[in-house]
Regions:
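Sec-dependent signal peptide recognition
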Residues: 2-10
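Enriched but not universal
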Residues: 4, 290-294, 336-341
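Sec/Tat signal peptide C-region and signal peptidase I cleavage site
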Residues: 13-19
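Boundary of Sec targeting at the N-terminus
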Residues: 19-20, 339
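GH16 jelly-roll
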Residues: 20-300
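C-terminal outer-membrane/trafficking sorting elements
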Residues: 301-342
Length: 342
């Protein structure tokens, strides 16, 4: 994971976010040789995700590679029709549980979703980091985007139909869900798009391509309202640290397909979801939290007061930080508060 920006890119990002007083706290651009296991977990299981999914998730469905059309370095999750561990198909799923988690802020992800046709179910989402302690649905689930729902089958709108959702409850059969589906004006598959969620103590809003279309309303909005029952109190459940998840499921309850022979999306070979980058921004208020191993290790300070060019570690890469106290560990440079800037 590299946290390296050209000065021009950093200024552009800062200018975009300053209007809402958000500052970049985490950038995952997937340019390393392998996935950073200090931050990411690769899931290995064939349990169906609680949704009767068909795939076996394993390491072979996850890699860092170049997206062939754009040349972008990406996290690649690939769904494949093949026999493996008693299943007829495989895929990839990753998460940051127990490693990188945060409370409140803005999260953006630039993703190229596969052609879902009938049968693929790609998603980018998050759950409460207390999952191991309280389980689902008590931990809360927020789906920033899911594609591939059966409602679009037969309408020719699979590439434009998606939803955002929230789920919480006391047990599996007592779940409160709030899901909003939309048929978008244009296709969101097979090219890169930016999915955004703005999460505050009082609300959650989700946007598609907010950078290119700032005038568009959120496709999902929810107020985080209190409730007398703590298991359903959205202000409490969705006011705790969350980790992020990305996956490409095959079949299951969402697409309503339970036999690999009915998964038309894989008829001509594997399909992949490409994630170019993920960024988290925060405002620096007391209610926000952010935890990441690369930002929390003990580090030694170095005073760069008055130094115009700070550390030229790679040819052509210079970070300008006049008059600031930075701290450094390994390949990363941090502000004194622990926010990664390189």
């Amino acid at each position: 994971m590299k946290h390296l920006f050209s000065l021009f890119a950093a200024v552009c990002l800062a200018g975009t976010m300053m209007a809402q007083d958000y500052q970049l706290v985490w950038n995952e651009d997937f340019t390393d040789a392998s996935l950073d296991n200090q931050v990411w977990n690769i899931e290995v299981n064939g349990d169906g995700g609680g949704n009767n999914e068909l795939q076996y998730y394993y390491e072979g469905g996850v890699k860092l590679d170049v997206e062939p059309t754009t040349g972008k370095h990406c996290l690649v999750l690939t769904a494949t029709k093949e026999d493996y561990m008693g299943k007829k198909c495989t895929s990839g799923r990753v998460n940051t549980k127990g490693k990188m988690y945060y409370t409140f802020g803005r999260i953006d992800a630039r993703i190229k979703f596969p052609n879902t046709a009938n049968g693929l179910w790609p998603a980018f989402w998050q759950m409460g980091n207390n999952f191991d302690q309280v389980g689902w649905p008590r931990c809360g689930e927020t789906d920033l985007i899911e594609l591939g729902h059966q409602s679009a089958f037969g309408k020719g709108t699979q590439d434009r139909y998606f939803n955002g959702a929230m789920h919480v409850g006391s047990k599996w059969d007592a779940v409160w869900s709030d899901a909003k589906s939309v048929t978008w004006p244009y296709s969101v598959e097979d090219t890169f798009h930016i999915v955004t969620m703005i999460w505050t103590p009082t609300s959650i809003d989700m946007y598609m391509d907010k950078d290119a279309h700032p005038e568009l309303e959120p496709y999902f909005h929810a107020d985080l309202e209190p409730n007398d029952n703590a298991d359903y109190d959205r202000s409490i459940v969705f006011g705790k640290p969350n980790f992020i998840i990305a996956n490409v499921a095959i079949g299951g309850n969402f697409p309503g397909i339970f036999n690999i022979s009915n998964v038309t999306a894989l008829a001509n070979g594997p399909r992949s979801m490409y994630i170019d980058w993920i960024r988290i921004y925060q405002q620096g208020n007391a209610q926000e939290t952010f935890v990441c191993p690369t930002a929390s290790d003990p580090i030694e300070p170095e005073n760069t007061q008055g130094i115009e060019t700070v550390w030229d570690d790679e040819p052509g890469q210079k970070i300008l930080r006049n008059g600031q106290l930075l701290i450094r560990r390994g390949e990363h440079v941090y502000t004194i508060t622990g926010q990664i800037v390189k």
